[in-house]
């Protein structure tokens, strides 16, 4: 789940140098773009089919084959408020199906401490749940349903 900027920084510390999949629009944010490039993020242009998008799966496949770096994608496609539950975007399921890799769902309630909009509340605690991996045995439709149910069910417990 993606509720705040917290995940972008903290997940670097608990996973082994992950590769973030991000929307191209984030490359327009000064200073943040430097950080995203420094950690080896890969972007995708969600608005159109392009040559760079065609090479996207090839780039991810190379990373998986040549390193042990996990891939992180926020399936909502954007930050959401803590009680929002928008349907997940199909991009995560396309990566899952194309690469035939397991998925490690993570639920984080950081939106209460570092919200998308508004003041930070340092008196609250952020909880991170690393959930059971989803094996690469499902269709992309089944996977997306399982992923969404798994993460949103856990967030209800955390909130």
Which positions does each model-derived feature cover?
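Non-catalytic C-terminal accessory region of glycerolipid acyltransferases
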Residues: 13, 54-159
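Catalytic core of membrane glycerolipid acyltransferases/transacylases, capturing the structured
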Residues: 1-49
